[in-house]
Amino acid sequence: VSSSYRSIRAAVDGGRLHGGEWNASGATTVVAVHGITANHRTFAPLAEALPQHRLLAPDLRGRGASRTLPGPWGIDRHAEDVARLITASGGGPVVLVGHSMGGFVAAALVRRFPDLVSGLVLVDGGLPFPPPPEGVDVDQAIAQTLGPALQRLRRTFPSREAYQRFWRAHPALHEAWSEAVADYVDYDLVGNPPELRSSVSSQAVSQDARDQYQDPDTADLLGGFTGPARLLVVSRGLLGQPPGLYPEEELVRWRRRLPSLPIDEVPQLNHYTIILHPSGAARVAAAVCTLS
């Protein structure tokens, strides 16, 4: 962990939301929100890429050190928690970054608490998914999308090394393994050998997943938020292969519906490496710098 890092916490309904802070003396505050089965350490490479920015990142309710916070979960509940963290950490406005499900949380936050946010960067997330086809329920759809990331929640691991091997074999990460990825993975483990497990609540994942499906033609993405915003999307998905999470026809639809939201397509990177690889973190950092 970087020498500029420290643990943080903020009071929320039901207990304390935990997370981390990097570069505390930075002039501009960035708040970064992680994905559905992730934790705040996913943003360590972004902190390295933004040495002049103070970066705050929570473990969302039901994940990491916030795993014991009670439900209900859901996108709006997470948005309320992150708003509490912003207020407890000096107040806004901040530049808000949301990756994957964190993009949905970030979009909900700017709709509900626009005064807390000066700029918004969505990273391969935040645009609602069309409801699953008839005969496919949300749990099936999310299992197909997340693959190994969801499967691990039902498993135990005999050692930290075994968990590292599981993640090293992940098709989106095996060529991008680094100290930062190893730290992110290790932080996720709770319990004791030989029954180590992920900190992520499968109940939280199931409830949060439902909030990501909505008819895109009726979705109110940013509400009355008038600050600068942009979306980065990658060409490869959660298993490291094309296509990305958002098909081209969905991007065309959103460019037409929301011309005020520039959409930048990032080649070569996948849903994980856009955040965890230095080249991906650099692209996100560049987007942050255009808004701050």
PLM features: residue spans?
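Conserved serine/cysteine hydrolase catalytic core
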Residues: D188-R257
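A catalytic-pocket lid/entrance helix-loop region that shapes and gates access to the active site
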Residues: V123-F157
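Active-site loop/oxyanion-hole signature of alpha/beta-hydrolase fold enzymes
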Residues: L60-V97
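Conserved hydrolase catalytic core segment
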Residues: G92-V136
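Alpha/beta-hydrolase fold catalytic core
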Residues: V1-V30, P51-R54, G92, Q144-L146, ...
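Conserved alpha/beta-hydrolase catalytic His-Asp/Glu region
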Residues: R154-D208
